[in-house]
Regions:
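C-terminal transmembrane helical hairpin of 12-TM major facilitator-type secondary transporters
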Residues: 296-339
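A membrane-interface helix-boundary motif in multi-pass transporters
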Residues: 173-186, 376-400
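Juxtamembrane intracellular "pre-TM" segments in multi-pass secondary transporters
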Residues: 8-20, 200-237, 259, 422
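Conserved MFS/SLC helix-loop-helix module at the cytosolic interface between two early adjacent transmembrane helices
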Residues: 75-114
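Helix-to-loop junctions at the C-terminal end of transmembrane segments
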Residues: 77-89, 281-295
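Multi-pass alpha-helical transporter architecture, strongest
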Residues: 192-198, 396-422
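Cytoplasmic helix-loop-helix junction between adjacent transmembrane helices
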Residues: 120-159
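Short amphipathic helix-loop junctions that connect adjacent transmembrane helices
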Residues: 43-60, 250-267
Length: 422
């Protein structure tokens, strides 16, 4: 990514030049991370299926176990890395995470068996804190009242990565199913080198806090979320949304391949379209939506759009109708930045890293539950023992969970007051 590309990122009102540049660095870091992840997304489930004698139900169960193992490692490691980022700074944690991700992709590119693939996912889970630390980085350099908008701008990197990544991954996977892993490894390692050379530290020594195992363990980190009733309510909203979100990576590839007969290339293009819609929402709609609707209404509309999108996914009888659900689903993108912005104002300045570590733990708990839950439901409802065939059952459950997020967001207290530094 060039300096010109960085300069093209929209300026954020109320931010100085150095702060805008720092957010630009984080934008590129997240973009390269998501590009790498997006490249292997259409391929990994099919690679597992090839190790499972092309049995879709068995591959779904194994893929769910892979996702659960990855989330377990992230759940244990993320609070530790969040606490370390509060103590030693964000930069070393981000660099370590990118290095680990690159090694993970190399291992998977060489994996001769499911066991080696599994080991690669374990390594990735341990070092997967770069996103949460990147959000803590943003909290360091962004005024509290501007954070939701900046989270939305940086969130566009997720969409851009998923525009390019799945399309490239699908095309490369058509040549060789291992090739996307090699390219993803190269991108991740280049990202680590990029950060080593140009990424400045965002947390000055005077704002750092001591590392405490009590807060760094997963239970201690999550305990922060119970310190405030509004924070706890937002954590419930985020937890339900995170569990629902797991339905997409857990079953999207296997579902569309099984129900509509899509190839890796077509799946990659569909995921790229998801990325296009996400980038439009995150990059163009989040700021105006937050300004016009307010954070709570943005949550309600966003999570509600996601629930409707899941309903379309579950019931669409043809692939053409499934495509209609994609832009509806991506309205969900206006809800996440609103929730993140509200939560950062409910903790002190020296707890931002701990908050992001805690929220990563919440996400990890969701990802512990979600992959196995959704793939098991999918495998059951396409199996011979199901009372009726319903391959879209995982998406129906995800829609119910997002409806819970809507209900809690609509009834929770406001989050306008910022907690003073303690």
């Amino acid at each position: 990514m060039t300096e010109e590309a960085t300069a093209q990122q929209p300026p954020v009102p109320g931010m100085t030049g150095p702060r805008r540049a720092a957010v630009g660095f984080i934008f590129i870091t997240i973009l390269l991370d998501m590009l790498s992840i997006g490249m292997i997304l259409p391929i990994l489930p099919k690679l597992i299926e090839s190790f499972s004698n092309d049995n879709t139900a068995d591959a779904a169960r194994i893929y769910g176990l892979f996702g659960t193992a990855w989330a377990l490692m992230q759940f244990v490691a993320s609070p530790v890395l969040g606490g370390l980022s509060d103590r030693f700074g964000r930069r070393p944690v981000i660099l370590l995470s990118n290095l680990g991700l690159g090694l993970d992709y190399i291992l998977m590119a060489l994996a001769p068996s499911l066991g080696w693939l599994f080991l690669g996912r374990v390594i990735s889970g341990i070092t997967s804190a770069s996103i949460s630390t990147a959000f803590a980085y943003i909290a360091d350099v962004t005024p509290a009242e501007k954070r939701a908008a900046v989270f939305g701008k940086v969130g566009a990197a997720f969409g851009l990565g998923f525009i390019i990544g799945p399309a490239i991954g699908g095309l490369l996977g058509g040549v060789d199913p291992r090739l996307p892993f090699w390219v993803a490894a190269g991108l991740s390692l280049c990202n680590a080198l990029y950060g080593l050379l140009v990424l400045p530290e965002s947390l000055p020594p005077e704002r750092r806090s001591p590392f405490r195992w009590k807060s760094a363990n997963p239970v201690g980190a999550v305990r922060l979320l119970a310190s405030n009733s509004r924070l706890a309510a937002m954590a419930v909203v985020e937890f339900c949304a995170e569990v629902a979100h797991v339905a997409l990576p857990a079953t999207f590839v296997l579902y569309t391949s099984y129900r509509y007969g899509w190839s890796e290339t077509k799946i990659g293009l569909a995921l790229a379209f998801v990325g296009v819609c996400t980038a439009i929402v995150q990059g163009g709609l989040v700021g105006p939506a937050l300004k016009r609707l307010g954070e709570r209404n943005a949550q309600i509309i966003g999570y509600g759009g996601g629930a409707l999108g899941f309903l379309i996914y579950a019931l669409a009888p043809t692939g053409a109708l499934f495509w209609i659900g994609i832009p509806v689903m991506t309205l969900w993108g206006i809800a996440g930045p609103a929730t993140s912005g509200m939560m950062t104002r409910l903790v002190a300045a020296d707890q931002q890293g701990q908050l992001q570590g805690a929220m990563t733990s919440v996400k990890s708990i969701a990802e512990l539950i979600g992959p196995f839950l959704f793939t098991l439901i999918f495998a059951y409802f396409i199996g011979a023992n199901a009372p009726f065939a319903l391959p879209g059952a995982p998406f129906l459950l995800a829609g119910v969970l997002l409806s819970v997020s809507v209900l809690v967001a609509a009834t929770a207290g406001d989050a306008r007051q910022r907690v003073p530094a303690g």
